[in-house]
């Protein structure tokens, strides 16, 4: 799918009636470049626009640099990247000007980033986990693609896919999107969950007979540091952009305790060592304080959830430069679903 086709699809899906309060249009492009509005060299270049350029006219623009939204701005795009951002000037428009998409009744802003997604499932799947055994490979791939498309259409141009029971489907979807054969955001994926048998990342639920558990979901299961190192390397060679360890129990897994550690510090260190050898980062699913501390000391780059961490562990993370991706909205969903 070409950039103009993507733009038209987005414009159609986001076409909202003009309101007194500007409706929100998210400028969602598969390749967004950074722009410094004070850079005059780009302004000069814009005077020599090419026929392949695309221009968007935005009623309001939130560019991430100015303290206030900018009024009536034009964004010039070339080869999928932002070339210039400047005030709209009617007198400069001519028959030779590149085509302009009029979004003067909308607000534009750069694409958003979601740091914690799982495209290979839906929220309602937690009501009956047997759906994971009943979906075919094609159905799972389509689910990933559908969720990716929905995510892009709501304004998120980059996502961090933090583990999957069906990592191969995510790899396939990422490839299709990169080849412009499907509509979706950039996907950085951790591949399979690296987890202990029966742990928070193991697809073991009463609804699924053991002999029907999809083998794809078992790619990251290990019991010792050496096994975790093997699984980590296999995930990277299969296409993982980074790695995800399930250091503690998980809220929606059966038979696990979110407040209890599952992987040992040695297990996590083994994964981190492999990741560093390949120039990859590691994130850790942690709820328990002990798991958070173990993961930090083992050398992970970030923590997911971090629900039960003590202040001292948070201070340790700050000292070690460990980032947090806490997805705090999950609390409301958990209270509702149980």
Language-model regions, residue ranges each:
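C-terminal motif of bacterial Sec signal peptides marking the signal peptidase cleavage site
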Residues: 30-33
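Active-site mouth loops of central-metabolism enzymes
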Residues: 129-142, 212-229
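Divalent metal-dependent hydrolysis catalytic cores, especially in the metallo-beta-lactamase
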Residues: 144-170, 183-193, 240-253, 281, ...
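Metal-associated gating/positioning segment near the N- to mid-region
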Residues: 106-175, 179, 197, 266, ...
